[in-house]
Structures are given as C-alpha cells and as structure tokens.
Regions:
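Short catalytic/ligand-gating loop segments at beta-alpha or beta-beta junctions
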Residues: 157-166, 183, 192-212
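Short glycine/proline- and acidic residue-enriched helix-loop micro-motifs
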Residues: 166-175
C-alpha cells in the first residue's frame, strides 16, 4: 500500500522565523523569496492516494507559507511560481524550466520548492530537505521512500558529457551558494524537530529545477 507523507503548514512556516545568531546570519540579505508549489496541472499531479494529490497539498503549504512571510516579514517580497492548479508545459523539463525562469526573472534571493513524498510502507514518515548535489552512499542506502523523487525531475548522469557539465556546475554552485544552502537546509530541519517530526536529514539530489535557477535554493 502506498501512503503519503504529509507536510503540515506549521512545519513549513517554521523556516521563515529562524531564531538566534545563526538564523540572523542566514536570513541577512534575503529580499525576495520565491516559493514553488511542486507539481500541478492534470499531467503532473505528483504523489496521490485515495483522491488526495500532492500538487494540492504543496499549493496549500506554499500559499500559507507565503502569507506568513508577508504578515511577519514585511521587508521580504514573496513571489509564487503558481497560485492555482496549473502546469507550464506538457513536457516536465520545460515545466521545471518555466518555474526557474520565474525565480530568475524575479531576482530571487532564495528559492523554496515544496513537495510531499510517498512510500509503499505505512511506517515511512518524517521530513527532509534537499539541496543540489550528488547523493552520498549513505543517502542512497537510506532512501526508503520509494516514490520520493520522480526520475524525470532528476538529471541523468549516464552521459559522460552531461555528467562533466553538471559536476562543474555543482562545483561552482557550492563555491557561490553551497555553504548558505546547506546552512539554511539544516536550519529548516532543526525547526522541523521542534514539532516532534522524524528528521530524515539534509540530502543532496541532482534536481533539474534547482539547476535552472541562479540563486540559493532547496526543496522541502
């Protein structure tokens, strides 16, 4: 049986309000936050179970998160990739590119893509945050969430030329934003822990959507 791993609004909200010096340092300089509700439209509903679709859950969380930022952090502009149930193309790569284009055009400082994963096992639970990079052996070994990542949303590294380009991009990304992205991701996970949710940790994945953006980014 396949079950959804539900992300709650209060957990998503926690990433907006980091406490202490670490949070202040990470939040400094963020003026535009781009929030992406993952999936959308009839062709890309995402994970689903008994009439509940990931695309709808993601949108509710994204809109709620945006309102919390706007109400509590008036100095930060919020930009959404979508505010309704929509897709940008019947081609998934073009759909992801369109979301990244919105973020790039907005001059975003931070890109947050919200997803709700699914698994065959009813015992699978918890929250995780993804940043751009290649999976570690430990991450691959612990991927018990079978449907966590749509393969079409990941970069295919089978082609040597593509792999070389992607690894060069990752190296540049880590030099520019890597430390920030990982620090933000760990802060997100730390705040999730306040609500007694199982911490699945920060993981690296070769995410197409993130590779198209020119800003600090993570998926949660």
């Amino acid at each position: 049986m396949r079950t959804l791993l539900f992300a709650t609004l209060v957990l998503a909200a926690s990433i907006c309000f980091p406490n202490g010096a670490a949070g202040d340092n990470i939040a400094r300089g963020v003026k535009v936050v781009v929030i992406d509700a993952g999936h959308g439209g009839p062709k890309f509903p995402g994970a689903h179970y008994r009439g509940v679709y990931e695309k709808d859950l993601n949108l509710k969380v994204a809109l709620r998160l945006g309102r919390l930022i706007e109400d509590n952090l008036p100095g930060i502009k919020v930009v959404y990739t979508r505010k309704t149930d929509k897709q940008f193309s019947d081609n998934l790569s073009l759909d992801l590119q369109a979301r990244a284009d919105i973020a790039n055009k907005a001059g975003g400082d931070l890109f947050i893509s919200i997803h709700t994963n699914a698994a065959r096992s009813a015992s699978a639970k918890g929250v995780e945050t993804l940043i751009m990079g290649e999976s570690t052996t430990e991450t691959r070994r612990n991927e018990d969430v079978l449907y966590a990542y749509n393969k079409e949303e990941l970069i295919d590294m089978a082609d040597a030329k593509t792999a070389a380009i992607v690894r060069a991009y990752i190296q540049n990304l880590q030099f520019t934003y890597g430390e920030y992205s990982e620090a933000m991701a760990r802060l997100v996970q730390k705040n999730y822990g306040k609500f007694s949710r199982q911490d699945r940790g920060v993981k690296r994945q070769l995410l197409k959507a993130v590779s198209y953006t020119h800003l600090r980014a993570h998926e949660t």
